[in-house]
């Protein structure tokens, strides 16, 4: 496993990147903690703090310096595009190591794809800047590697971990994200939120 932060395309700055997230509720956070603690003290693989666990629906091209008018336009566009979309059920598997971290993943679904598409349409409606790539599917990152990590150590730690199970996404959050490569974490400030269905 290689460093996530060495392989990621650098942001123009490390703070203020606008994202739309879905957030776990307390029950899901408890289930994620059960598998996250299996990674305690793995060198080069700090666990994401439970309060910052999230599903990325889309990273946007804009940063939080777009001003109040820009933020209002973005929120209005998101409200329009999300109108009528229903909550989305996801079925999360067991934690698994990847090339740059450990994730808990769920298969994509028409409902998930509709959420991602709606958010990206809204972002494109208020900015000509090209959007970053969409996420490969619904997932929660439990840990991001900050240095090379022996995959065998991670596989051994996760042996016997069971699927996390079902969760229903009932809301979305527009957030201003800070990446902290020195800590191996992301955190954010919430700017707006929507319950599903909107309207």
What are these regions (language model features)?
Residues 1-199:
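Histidine-dependent nucleotide/RNA phosphoesterase domain, centered on the 2H-phosphoesterase fold
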């Amino acid at each position: 496993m290689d460093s996530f932060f060495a392989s990621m395309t650098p942001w123009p700055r490390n703070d203020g990147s606008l994202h739309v997230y879905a957030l776990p509720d307390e029950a899901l956070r408890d289930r994620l903690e059960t598998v996250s603690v299996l990674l305690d003290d793995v060198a080069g693989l700090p666990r994401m703090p439970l309060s910052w666990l999230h599903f990325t629906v889309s990273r946007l091209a804009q940063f939080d310096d777009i001003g109040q008018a820009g933020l209002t336009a973005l929120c209005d566009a998101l409200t329009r595009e999300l109108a009528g979309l229903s909550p989305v059920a996801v079925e999360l598997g067991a934690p698994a190591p990847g090339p740059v971290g450990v994730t808990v993943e769920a298969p994509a679904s028409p409902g998930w794809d509709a959420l991602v598409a709606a958010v990206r349409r809204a972002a494109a409606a208020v900015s000509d800047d090209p959007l970053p790539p969409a996420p490969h599917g619904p997932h929660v990152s439990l840990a991001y590697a900050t240095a090379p990590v022996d995959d065998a150590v991670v596989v051994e730690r996760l042996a016997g971990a069971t699927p996390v199970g079902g969760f229903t996404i009932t809301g979305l959050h527009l957030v201003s994200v800070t990446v902290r490569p020195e800590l191996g974490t992301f955190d954010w400030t919430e700017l707006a939120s929507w319950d599903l269905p909107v309207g």
